Amino acid sequence: MTAWRAAGITYIQYSNIAARILRESLKTGLRADAAKRDASHVKFTPWANGKPAQRQTQSES
């Protein structure tokens, strides 16, 4: 059994923890570059009555 399964977490949770620890261990200059790559953007279009409503953009850093 893998360590992350034995700990009772999913692979995604394990991967996120490992990535966070790696980013925290970087030197200051490299840490800033890694933080820029960490941002994500999601476009979401809700539908009402069979037609798309106003598009929404979500940004997370």
Swiss-Prot record:
Disulfide bonds: none
Disruption-associated phenotype: Embryonic lethal. Heterozygotes show increased lifespan and enhanced resistance to oxidative stress. ATP levels are normal.
CDD domains according to UniProt: F1-ATPase_epsilon (cd12153)
GO molecular function terms attached to this record: G protein-coupled receptor binding; proton-transporting ATP synthase activity, rotational mechanism
Recorded GO CC terms: extracellular space; mitochondrial inner membrane; proton-transporting ATP synthase complex
Region spans: Sufficient for mth activation: 3-15
Pfam families for this protein: ATP-synt_Eps (PF04627)
GO BP of this protein: determination of adult lifespan; positive regulation of G protein-coupled receptor signaling pathway; proton motive force-driven ATP synthesis; proton motive force-driven mitochondrial ATP synthesis; proton transmembrane transport; response to oxidative stress
Family the UniProt entry places it in: Belongs to the eukaryotic ATPase epsilon family.
Function: Activates the G-protein coupled receptor mth in vitro, leading to increased intracellular calcium ion levels.
Protein name (record): Protein stunted
The organism of origin for this protein: Drosophila melanogaster
Protein's gene: sun
